[in-house]
């Protein structure tokens, strides 16, 4: 039985002291469970990799298509690659820390596995309590494309 993926708006409240940028991004809900919470990205002041185009049109226009491609058409069949799902809300740089996932696919489905916290200079910290998940390709593609719709 395939897992169900749904995007949900994720809001980070901004402030002036300390300076924090307000962000509207997306959480990834799998079978009704927030990956933002399950991966503890919420404890590290991260945001989703997709900007919500209803609130962050310019950022969504600049980055969402590329991110959607990394999660869909650019995924090598059988081998896969790693993609950041939750990133620094200020710069999205891996060096600030990110929650990543191995994305792989076959002709009928896409798999998310090997969730980890990475920063590019320390050994990754595996998040063994999260995943793996398998999504039916057509439904998955429809939901990911929703993030890049303007």
Specify the residue positions occupied by each region the protein language model found.
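Intrinsically disordered, low-complexity acidic regions enriched in Pro/Ser/Thr
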Residues: 1-150
């Amino acid at each position: 039985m395939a897992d169900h993926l749904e995007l949900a708006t994720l809001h980070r409240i901004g402030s002036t002291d300390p300076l924090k940028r307000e962000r509207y991004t997306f959480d990834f809900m799998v079978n009704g469970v927030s990956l933002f919470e399950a991966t503890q990205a919420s404890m590290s002041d991260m945001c989703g990799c997709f900007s919500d185009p209803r609130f962050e049109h310019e950022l969504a226009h600049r980055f969402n298509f590329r991110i959607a491609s990394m999660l869909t058409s650019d995924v090598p069949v059988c081998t896969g690659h790693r993609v950041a799902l939750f990133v620094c809300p200020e710069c999205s740089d891996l060096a600030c820390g990110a929650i990543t996932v191995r994305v792989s696919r076959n002709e009928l489905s896409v798999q998310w596995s090997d969730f980890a916290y990475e920063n590019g200079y320390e050994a990754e910290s595996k998040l063994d309590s999260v995943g793996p998940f398998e999504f039916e390709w057509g439904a998955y593609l429809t939901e990911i494309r929703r993030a890049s719709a303007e």
